[in-house]
Amino acid sequence: MGDAGSERSKAPSLPPRCPCGFWGSSKTMNLCSKCFADFQKKQPDDDSAPSTSNSQSDLFSEETTSDNNNTSITTPTLSPSQQPLPTELNVTSPSKEECGPCTDTAHVSLITPTKRSCGTDSQSENEASPVKRPRLLENTERSEETSRSKQKSRRRCFQCQTKLELVQQELGSCRCGYVFCMLHRLPEQHDCTFDHMGRGREEAIMKMVKLDRKVGRSCQRIGEGCS
């Protein structure tokens, strides 16, 4: 009986307090339920952190070893016979010094003008301008007229110097200004310089009858003229 009373007289022990201020328990490491749950969440992260770092280092080392193996496999050793020769490159690629004079000569040949002689120029001008020919002929005829000497006596033929009578002088006078006998009075016989054909054409044109066309121009009513 005395022991029971002594136990009852003892005060019950209080549970420990959590750092947050709530009551904890010995099962939860003297922490409340919330703090204990947070502690459990943090614990696996702390445990997995070194493991993940170790796994990453292992993977990196494996990748480096695999890369080294691949490079050792893919890089073949070239024999001296397979290596490219420098002479082949020099043959295929033309140098600028060789191409330079070729282009210069081509430009020079294009730029240099062709020289023409004076004879060819005069021939081309004569062929291109046919209108100038009659003028040249007229100039030559005038020079021939001036070169001919004047007839001293009109009683003799200018060609054969035979004596002419008065009737023969009148019949043998030519438009070129000279007097000829009956044998040389025609223009074809004494190389006449006068243009008889041109003069005949001009005279024919002057003698042509010009018609005055009055049909359709005057408008008169019937009976106006009679009145």
From Swiss-Prot:
PANTHER family: AN1-TYPE ZINC FINGER PROTEIN, AN1-TYPE ZINC FINGER PROTEIN 3
ZnF (A20-type) ranges: 12-44
Region of interest (Disordered), residue spans: 41-100, 113-148
UniProt keyword annotation of Zinc present: yes
A Pfam entry, by short name: zf-A20
Organism field: Homo sapiens
Keywords attached to this entry: Metal-binding, Zinc, Zinc-finger
ZnF AN1-type: positions: 151-200
Name this protein carries in UniProt: AN1-type zinc finger protein 3
Residues noted as binding Zn(2+) 1 in the record, renumbered to the chain: 18, 20, 32, 35
Residues annotated as binding Zn(2+) 2: 157, 160, 181, 184
Chain intervals with Polar residues compositional bias: 49-59, 78-94, 113-127
PROSITE patterns: ZF_A20, ZF_AN1
Positions of disulphide bridges: none
Keyword Secreted carried by entry: no
Gene Ontology MF: a single term: zinc ion binding
Listed Basic and acidic residues bias regions: 135-148
Biased composition (Low complexity): 66-77
Binding-site positions, Zn(2+) 3: 174, 176, 190, 192
